[in-house]
């Protein structure tokens, strides 16, 4: 790594820290939504087992009106087992009560349930009746079309189950789920019959209620990467409950492409097939625990004078995997944070991830994939590195003349700058020639940081001593925390620090002052501190990038030189250039 790379990467570290700490958009709490939660009631039946407020018998008619009869019933569970997940549906609310992914384990390498609200379920229809009753369908019992308790699916096999709630003659709510054996997406259809004029403004909401359960060991990292969001008008609306003492709310009108709630590596999303009226997002911290709870809802309107109205959606609960999300063709991959949309995101989506996909077809070892990727990047950037090294070699060769010039014109800065420009021009040297190649690589380096920080492909992938390339490769837990360093010792950053030192040592430099000598030691230490708490995959990449840089520098030093510099002389102070007489004699 040359000196300009040193400066560039120092800037990368500083900008990343500032960006992560201070540049996240602030979410301001907004007023309560018009639909208030049902409160102040007592639990009445042990078999209801709800996370939503249950109601005392005497309060049922007052609370639920014509829906009162549906508040009593027997909960019937249905387990759907396909190649990717095991889901549990409940007839109480016709909701999703459990979702366990088969290909992704938690930090203890165990299967885990993504649904936080496992008692009440995650999905609900929420509306207010004309007589002022607030209805959450998770408080109501539906009748399932199938009495099976378990259904297994593989390949393209599909299964449909219908949940029906009869409110009155010719007045009902029907919810239909359709599962397929080899996909994460679940078709979700809701149908209202006889509800025209029953709801104020004919409005209702379809909600995902509750954040996803965390799966990672580093809870602070989970908190940083958890939020609710909506995709509207080609832009991402994001609500992050960053302050646990506040409750955040956001409502917007308009057509939404989707709503979603995510953790670091997993996401739950509702994707409508017809235009919506708006979205509602809510987020807050959980008292006494490190968890951010979120609600995301789509707003719909029942058309007037329409006896039966249906909405079709896709429910997606699965990994934050770029290829999986992109395959849905609804821009759900926009939920992935790749930094600036105008700079680093194109590098991530169109260069880094496609190369990773290609390499993953050659080997399933992601440690090897990272090493090969680092080698490819060095080969691609070789012309830039060569240009940078040659420029610095020329600058180094000019140093004696630069020092002489500075001494000669120390009292005449204007003349000194003029002479510097002349010398650079005659030598064919651009003072910025060493910096420009590094600056051109900055977007790629930034994009690498974001991809390696968020890529689920590295999660729980081991390499050498690193048990998980998405976590620091800790070889020793200290039991206490060192400021700026952390509570553990990671090996890749130590090796990388050594490689950075060696790379600086063998790289030609145009300066040999004490400050640059100090950087030989300061920068490796800075890199050690910065990378100790970053994913091992990122540390491995930069380690190998520097190892290949060392080999590349040895080769360039051996095959190139600054001997082709033209002969350049300094003007003697106070002496004008001499003219020649005719005949070749000097005047």
From Swiss-Prot:
* Location(s), subcellular: Cell inner membrane
UniProt record similarity statement: Belongs to the OXA1/ALB3/YidC family. Type 1 subfamily.
Q: What does this protein do?
A: Required for the insertion and/or proper folding and/or complex formation of integral membrane proteins into the membrane. Involved in integration of membrane proteins that insert both dependently and independently of the Sec translocase complex, as well as at least some lipoproteins. Aids folding of multispanning membrane proteins.
Please give the residue ranges the record annotates as the region Disordered: 567-587
Can you tell me where the transmembrane regions are? 5-25, 338-358, 367-387, 432-452, 482-502, 520-540
Segments of skewed composition (Basic residues): 577-587
| Keywords tagged on the record | Cell inner membrane, Cell membrane, Chaperone, Membrane, Protein transport, Transmembrane, Transmembrane helix, Transport
Q: Which GO terms describe its molecular function?
A: membrane insertase activity
| GO terms for biological process, alphabetical | protein insertion into membrane; protein transport
Q: How does it sit in the membrane?
A: Multi-pass membrane protein
The terms describing its cellular component in GO are: plasma membrane
Q: Which InterPro entries match?
A: Membr_insert_YidC (IPR019998), Membr_insert_YidC_N (IPR028053), YidC/ALB3/OXA1/COX18 (IPR001708), YidC/Oxa/ALB_C (IPR028055), YidC_ALB_C (IPR047196), YidC_periplasmic_sf (IPR038221)
The protein, known as: Membrane protein insertase YidC
Which proteins does it associate with, and in what oligomeric form? Interacts with the Sec translocase complex via SecD. Specifically interacts with transmembrane segments of nascent integral membrane proteins during membrane integration.
Which Pfam family is one of those matched by this entry?
60KD_IMP
Q: Which organism is it from?
A: Chlorobium phaeobacteroides (strain BS1)
